Each structure stands twice: as structure tokens, then as C-alpha cells.
């Protein structure tokens, strides 16, 4: 599962293809080539989806941080 409700909501707002790649890569721990094979797309497609997803999440979560207390 995702570490925080704020992050979870941001991930759920991603486009379907990006959200799927993020969940499979970061939550399920799959490798890019495994995701590509499972989804029947080139590995570069998965890399691109993850890159776009990270950019969107970075912009949406700007200023958000983990409370270290």
C-alpha cells in the first residue's frame, strides 16, 4: 500500500496507464521489463509512463513532506 493518504490520493488522480505503472513498480516491486511484458508494451513505454507520473506527482506534492516526528 502507499505510505500516506496524501500520496495515495495523488496517485489515484494519475491517468490510468501511469497509475498502473506506478503501482506495479513502486507498490508491487516489479521491474520495468516485467511490467512491460505483463502489459505487452515496450520497456521504454513503461519508463516514459513512470517518468511522466513522477513529474505529475512531484508538481502535485510540491511542498508536501513526511513528518519526521
Question: Model-found features: residue ranges?
Answer:
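DNA-recognition helix of helix-turn-helix
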Residues: 33, 39-63
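Short, conserved catalytic or interaction motifs in soluble domains
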Residues: 16, 27, 52
Amino acid at each position: 500500500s502507499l505510505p500516506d493518504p496524501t500520496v495515495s490520493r495523488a496517485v489515484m488522480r494519475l491517468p490510468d496507464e501511469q497509475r498502473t505503472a506506478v503501482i506495479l513498480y513502486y507498490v508491487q516491486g516489479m521491474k520495468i521489463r516485467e511490467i512491460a511484458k505483463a502489459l505487452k508494451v515496450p520497456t521504454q513505454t513503461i519508463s516514459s509512463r513512470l517518468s511522466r507520473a513522477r513529474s505529475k506527482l512531484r508538481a502535485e506534492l510540491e511542498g508536501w513532506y513526511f513528518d519526521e516526528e
